[in-house]
């Protein structure tokens, strides 16, 4: 629905044109593709049929079956890991964020139909811990189980959970480099007797704020909708200048703007439903295999999850600051989770562009990135 050219065949366009869309759409909502088909018209990067609450007007005005095939697949994505296709949901969908509707495991027919129509994205590269040590699918599963268990822990702040998981991967990387793959089981066994708080404390060490700013600026720069005249490089430097206090930081997804100094005075302490939401969003990206896609190593893939978490953190605080509040509310967190899915996890042009993804991957290879992000957000250095 956002930033994608959505292809529609001529028969579907003819069917949709029988409905009067003039109440919401100015002009023809369909753009010829020059090959006999069409694209859905985009305005400011959004499909013209996408309502302000991110719900599809074709679905609400007509029926689900009247939507183009690619739209019917939303919010489902599939990752093929080995011979298994894992389904995951996009949190850009408001129903997913609200946890509305039937559980996905009760919708087997829809899953099978959508998988057949939309297909999956398979991993072709061997699994790697850190780009150096090749590991098996079984070893990946054992590491993932520990990470998911920690991320789901309701008694520790999410930042501690993220730091503990990042520290686990850092330890695995250093130990396997020294003694080989036998260190994997030794490390996983050793952390069973340690608390998340203890491991997270180790994970905060050696984090340099300077290592985080460039990564965040790349992803947050996609969201400066009010600066659409700028190139991607220009948007990157806009975020960098905002972090230096030279201008306000803008977010199109949050419809907000505030100085970085005001943003850092906002407390990001999700509770109740908002804590459950952002935990569910983060856990789903790991458990569903999103972090294992492409050629990413486990370290790089988890760092993508780290970036997603801190984008949620920053954007929620930005919206609160723009409204003069000192703490984030549920709406701040909900909209930030939706934005992170758009900017980082599922729909980011940066991820789907091979050139920019290679550049980003090189920045996401550091085992210290989570510690750097934590230090950066706390504002000890810009």
Positions of the model-derived regions?
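Conserved catalytic micro-motifs used in adenylation/nucleotidyl-transfer and phosphoryl/amide-
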Residues: 48-59
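General structural signal for secondary-structure boundaries
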Residues: 7-11, 96-104, 135-140, 329-336, ...
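Hydrophobic, aromatic-lined core segments that form the binding pocket/scaffold
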Residues: 144, 149-382
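Internal, well-ordered alpha/beta segment that forms a basic, Gly-enriched binding/recognition surface
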Residues: 62-160
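N-terminal cysteine/histidine-rich coordination modules
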Residues: 1-49, 64, 73-105, 109, ...
